[in-house]
């Protein structure tokens, strides 16, 4: 599918250079160093395995926050140990998802956003790393919608209450955070972690 649909284009402008690749890296795309969050990540990956949500051929979306990235690393190690392969990953992609693809633990990456330079390189070089429009991926009226095909969706939140309502808009002090990422499509999915 096209990355930008024609009905969203007013004009096309030719430029000498498109963007500054070295500024693509986001501050959120670093694995957490917090021992507590690393433990949460490890326990989450173990839960995915023990519950049967993680299996050979499963599909996964992993967020770009520090704990989400750590979960993806633990999942990658499990996949290698078991000889399993994810059917596809949906991104925002990072170097951790690219590593799964390049090492054979993921068949494809369907990518709506590249979060770091490894992901940018992979989209350019790897035929199994496929740009995928958010107009299709997140639109539950679209035949290209991915949310109902996802087995595992891992995203960060600042707060979760006892009824599993997630806050991704503010810190607990009420100050606005940043973009909400993939939450809007994940809420339509079968499994959200």
Give the predicted meaning of each segment:
Residues 65:
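Beta-strand-loop-alpha "switch" segments that mediate conformational coupling across diverse proteins
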């Amino acid at each position: 599918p096209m990355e930008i649909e024609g009905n969203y284009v007013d004009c096309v402008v030719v430029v000498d250079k498109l963007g500054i690749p070295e500024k693509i890296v986001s501050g959120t795309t670093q694995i957490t160093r917090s021992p507590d969050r690393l433990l949460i990540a490890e326990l989450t990956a173990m839960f995915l395995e023990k519950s049967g949500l993680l299996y050979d051929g499963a599909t996964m979306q992993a967020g770009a926050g520090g704990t989400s990235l750590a979960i993806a690393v633990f999942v990658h190690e499990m996949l290698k140990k078991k000889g399993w392969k994810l059917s596809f990953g949906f991104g925002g992609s990072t170097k951790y998802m690219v590593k799964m693809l390049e090492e054979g633990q993921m068949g494809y990456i369907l990518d709506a956003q590249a979060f770091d330079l490894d992901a940018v390189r992979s989209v350019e070089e790897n035929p199994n790393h496929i740009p995928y429009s958010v107009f299709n991926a997140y639109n539950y009226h679209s035949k290209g919608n991915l949310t109902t095909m996802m087995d595992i969706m891992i995203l960060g939140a600042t707060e979760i209450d006892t009824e599993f309502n997630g806050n991704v808009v503010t810190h607990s002090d009420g100050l606005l955070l940043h973009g909400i990422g993939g939450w809007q499509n994940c809420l339509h999915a079968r499994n959200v972690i």
